[in-house]
Structure formats: C-alpha cells, structure tokens
C-alpha cells in the first residue's frame, strides 16, 4: 500500500485499464523471514481481499504459471511446504520505462496443504492468508495445557499493598514476544478515552493525574488451556473500543492502534480519478444489518467493600463500612445503597476518612443532580492522583450493580409526540427521559447525525443489544457508553455505504479517505474504504466504502472536514453560527 499515490501510479493504472499486463512476484521466506527463493509467475486467475473489519485482514488465492517447474514440487525441501511463508507483490507494466512497477500485497502463510500443481495445464494454485493465521490456531498460536494469568497489579505479599499496576500495552507486547515470538511490532497505548490525544487536548495532564489507572488492566485476566494467542490479544484490544490489530503490507509489522479517525487525512483518491476508472456502482443496503440503538450490558460489578448503612446530609453521602480500615486505598471498589437522590457536585465520606468528590469516569467531571437514584446500589472506584506533589482522592462512579448504557442515533429534532408508561407518566417520544424509562437505563447518550437515513425518527427503534463475551470486560457505565457510541457509529456508517468496481488499483488499502459522486447524486461526498477485492483475471478492483461520519465532534474548518453534531447540548451548539448550523444540517462541508 502506497502512503502517497504518485502521478506515475495513476498514469500506469489508466494505461492498464485498456491493455493490462501483470506479473506476480512471490518471494519464499524461511522461518526467520529470510528470502530462500523466488517465483516469478504469470497470473492465470486469482483474487485478493482486504477487510478492515476482520481479524484476518488479508486473504488471497492465485492460479499461476511458474517459470521454474522444479520449484513447485510438494516436498519437504520445496519452496511450497508447510514451514515456508511467502511475500507477494504485483507488477504493472510501465510502457514509459519498459519495466514493471511492483506494489506489495503483504506476507502470507499457506492455508491448505500449500498448493496444487496441475501438469495438464501447467498451473499452480495457491491459497493463503496473512500472518494472523499463525496466531489463531490455524497454523500456530494454540496454547497447550497451561492456564495463563495476567494480574491487574502486583502487591506486597505481606501487607497486600499495591506495588505496581500492570499496563495493557505491556501485556500485549509480552504476549506477542513470549507466546508468539513476534518482535517486529508497533503497539500503541490502550486506555481510557480522555487519555488519548485524539479526543482530549489536555490528555497529557489527564495521564499524569491518573498515572496508575488510565492504561492499566482493570481486573485479573485468565485464559484456559487450548486458547489461542489471538484470543488473548483480542481480549486486551477490546478492553477499550475503537482499536484494531493487523499485520501491515509493507514490512509485515504487527500493529495495534486506534482505528484511524481520518478527520485530518487528505483525500487519498479523488472523484475525478475514480470516475475515469469506474466500471460499475452498487448502492444496495442490507436492511437486516441496520441498527440505530446500541444497548450495552457490561460487567456485573463486584466490589471489594459493601454497605447499606448510608445517610445523606448537606449533599454528602456518609457511610460506615466494616473492615475498610485506616484510609482510602487507590483502586478499591466500594458498593453503597444510596438513600436519596443527589444534588450537583455530590460528595462521599467513608468511615470518616475524609470527604471526597464523586466524579464521572469518562470526563472527570462531578456527577450531575439526580444521577444517583434512591434505594439503588451504586459502585464507586477510589482513585488517588498526584497533583502539585499532593495526593488528591476522588470517588469515580462505576454505575449500578450491572454496567448498562445506551446510545441512540437521532437527528436531534424534538418529536412533539408523547407516550404514556404503565405507571401513567407521559414522556416525549425519543427524548432522553423516554429511553431512560422504557429501556430502564440511566445512562442514555445521543449521537446526532442530522442527515443520516437511519435515525430513529425515520426508521423507528431498531436496537442492537450487546451482552456477554467481550462486553463483560466493560467495567463502568461511562466505558459502556463509549462502547455503545462506537458500536452504534459502526452500525450506521457500515450500512450507509456504496460498492464500486474499477480498473485494477493494487495500491489501495482500507481506512483511506476518498471523494466520490454517486450516479444518483449531483454532489461529491467523502467516504472511507472498508474492504477491497482485487480480481487478477478480470483486472478489476471492487471497493466497498462507507460515508464519512466523524465519531466525535471536532471543528476543523481549515481542513475542509465534513462536520456533524455529535453532542446535543447548548455548549456544543453555541460554537456554531446560524449559517454553520444550516450547512451542517444540510450535509454541506464547513
């Protein structure tokens, strides 16, 4: 995949659209990644697929005609055997230089016996997939008769005091290097939303103040015998939403990173070029996959200490917890039955250790009035931070006994309609109070995309309920709300898509921004490539791409980035002029 497409690349593609001349280069690698042979083949047929939504990102199959027949025997010492890997590239002939320009297709492992040779047609069939197959148990990666544990922290065996919290990124690196023997990797930080520079201008300050917790394993992780290396890696990846893992095509580096937002990315390929190589267009939408509400049920919260003895006076919850001694300890989780609803900036005091504030984990802001409901059990996590060389203790609200959050895709307009609940109360349809009541969920967030065809106001409620499995790793309502927003965004963006077929474009990759004007529209829009399929027999590329809807609100007028409203609050709306809001609602770019 070329990071920058040159004019030469575009000219070669345009020339090949009418008279394609291709050559496949296969380098055979040993277990150390060293080249031990080379097969230059003429392509009879074959295909390659790249799917940004799949753990196995790249697969390929080829029917080729080798030039050196002695290298294709299926024997232990041949170039096509179980212990061999291959690195492939495809060459397009450049009439100007009278030579081939090669584009990398990545490194692969054989997924069947290794290949079949047909003496009648003199053809070789190769089926393969990327190196994730070495981690998922297909070729390697299944672990033997042992239980693997990753504790959340190390503690003093005598006192039980926490010595060190274990970091998610370090656990991923340890898994790769010790269990898979992969040292060629690039692992980015995995952690809390507000600790990421993509989402918070003050991310460095947040990391400093939450040094012990922002990127640490939230609870002990244990994996049974027979699991795969990939299943362990996925568990750590999915502790927080919006991360991906894959092997890149250039150097076969294992990469773990946030899914690119593409906010500030330049257009990789523009509409004018795509129109010149366009063959067909398909805008079919699979309505069975459309969802506009995501409801996430997370972890059933297990607390270290619990008490039903609690009073509420002067906006302070005072509780006595037997066995909780001496002082607040960093990382302790506490369950308390709340006697009364709270006012703004509520505080808590346990065993007279001192009054501390109650905060939301997602934004580090004090909880708002009526966040805590009477006679409900809530869990809090104690966190100590170093601020100006002093310890600052806060209680972070994890949620009720089971983590629960909802995200709703809406156009942000009031319905003006009312429905009556079983207890006789009226609620405005699709209001926050409506969803809180009828979904029995306190944490309800809205994603507002004014021009989406899939909002609840247009299609009604189509829920996507996430429960069990990886969602049991979500440890607070705030984290569940982040995950619900991410899942709902995927649901709406992946259904608002288009598939086009073009002349062969071997330099493409997923998560790239392009501009394109649909045949039934008079305007260009920005899209993100989600999957690619190359057909080397017909010399075509099929591209599936989804409409670019930013996940989080951001103003980048100087970048020309398409804008939508992602939060429905006065504070956000006040950032825009009346003309800008009109442009956003109509789908224009700022």
Model-derived segments and spans:
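Short alpha-helix capping/helix-loop boundary micro-motifs
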Residues: 61-77, 319-321, 360-368, 496-504
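Acidic, glycine/polar-enriched metal-coordinating patches/loops
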Residues: 341-400
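Beta-strand-rich assembly/attachment modules of structural machines
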Residues: 2-165
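Short coil-to-beta-strand transition motifs
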Residues: 98-108, 375, 517-528
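Charged- and aromatic-enriched interaction segments used to assemble
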Residues: 118-287, 586-590
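Short coil-to-beta transition motif at edge beta-strands of beta-rich domains
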Residues: 77-96, 328-335, 503-518
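Exposed extracellular interaction/assembly regions and N-terminal maturation sites
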Residues: 304-354, 386-390
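Acidic, low-complexity/disordered segments
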Residues: 1-23, 119, 126, 142-143, ...
